[in-house]
Amino acid sequence: MDQKLENILNLALETPEEEREQTESLNVGYSAESRSWELIVKYHGSLDGLREQNIVVEELIAGYAILTVPETLVDTVSETPEIEYVEKPKRFYYQQTDPDGASCFPPVTRRTPFLNGRGVLLAVLDSGITWDLEVFRKADGSTRIRYLWDQTIPWDQTIPGKQAASREQETLRNPTLPQNQIMPEETGDTGYGRTPDGFPIGTEYTEEEINRALNSSVLERYGLIPSRDLTGHGTAVAGIAAGRSADGLYTGAAPEAELIIVKLGLPREEGFPRTTEIMRGVTYALRKARQLNMPLVINLSFGNSYGSHDGSSLLERFLDNASEIGRTVICVGSGNEGAARGHFAGNITRDGRVELAVGNYERNLNIQLWKNYSDVFRIRLQAPGGEEAELSTNIQGGKYTLELEQTRILVYLGEPLPYAVAQEIYLDMIPAEGSYINAGIWTIRLEPVVTVTGQYYLYLPAGSGIGESTGFYRATPQVTLPIPSTAAKVITVGAYDPVYDTYADFSGRGYADSTRTIGVAA
């Protein structure tokens, strides 16, 4: 086990590719075509030595970088003295966004103190935007979008009139397409867009280019700027944050703010963005705010349940650092996990039995158990048919495999790491036979051996990644904030139900000890 690498990355590297492909999370960040990993690192000094070894380096802010590393060189990265810690990307899921008049925007935007966002940059990192809507325009019809960076549209040398793509962009482009293939809607030399400075992917469109496109016919616009919000999620988020109708009947929180839009993600089968793409988007927004000399608000409406939820991951620390640069505020949604049955918390002196319902047709499922390193538990896992096995928790780190009924279980026991305060025991369930893991009630029994705090937390993947029938019995609604809303220096925004005048039941919740709380409920 390499203690510079996070636990789930160690497990991924120790697991054969054919098994990783069966899991929900272990293969995220790996390109089978180029046989390379995309990795997030915390570093100091210079990374020029890695560049000389065919490793692509994207420096971000505050000593963070994204590396694209041939799998044979991952050990080289870990052994580099300048590298402090390494994580793999995580897949992020959309968080619910329902606008509601109960948020009371109009009273503060239309009269004293006129908090309408004028003179402020609002960066929305999401699924894109329907950029020609009137709600994102000024009174004269011109756009309020200063920059639109679509990470999914490659800037390619095969299109006449366009500059050659960099080596980094060639490495990072969509691995599912041949290197010289461009999607039909991206072909043609329009004279619009370019790869943004300092980034190897995507196409950036300026305010001037968007206005030129707006002055063309409706049919021509998306031929000039082919960026589309296919899900509508990003458009809804931007509308809540900064929308404004021409008649003034609809207004968002900051109807006069200027916008930076980042459509996240390289085109890929699962369609969800990764940690790395969010970090690129945050860095891009910070650089634009510095260039324009404007205060910046960044909105993130994505979340993931993987992690100890204590602010210690590289993404959480990255956002804490980003919030200290210039005049920057970062707002993150509290997610939809409050009522999703994806979390169970207990104390070994009181709760020794955890029951998990697994619905039909689950192709894989992972379970995280987080506890104090000083606590020692005896853990037994029982399958729906009654077959039972004890987990060997006395192994010092590393992976092993066991089988219960028709389900193979990859077990990883974490060791102390520089950026991990709690110990992780990670279980990844994949089919041993057939296409699905065993449905029914799985039981986890915990027995104390050495107790210091006795506290433990269990997490499943975010609700968007599992079936509705899968979840813990007696689930715990507390500590269901998704990462990165658990970062210490972001504003976490919860959901409020005006019909019942209460906190929305689906909205993620924080810790009962009040050290980490929801900043706003709207």
Task: Please report, for each region that a protein language model flagged, where it lies by residue.
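Extracellular S/T/G-rich loop segment that most often corresponds to the catalytic His/Ser-adjacent loop
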Residues: Q151-P154, E185-N215, A340-Y426, I430-G434, ...
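Short, aromatic- and glycine-rich surface loops/edge beta-strands on solvent-exposed regions
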Residues: V77, I367-Q368, A439-P448
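Catalytic cores of secreted or luminal carbohydrate-active enzymes
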Residues: V297-I298, L315-A345
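Intrinsically disordered, low-complexity segments used as extracellular stalks/linkers
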Residues: Q157, G161-Q163, R167-Q169, R173-P175, ...
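Autoinhibitory N-terminal propeptides
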Residues: M1-I66, T72-T112, R118-L121, D140-G141, ...
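Short acidic, glycine-rich surface-loop motifs adjacent to enzyme active sites
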Residues: V262-L264, V282-D310, G333-S334, R445-V449
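Subtilisin-like serine protease catalytic core
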Residues: R110-D156, E168, E185-T276, N293, ...
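Edge beta-strands of jelly-roll/beta-sandwich modules across compartments, strongly enriched
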Residues: T451-A462
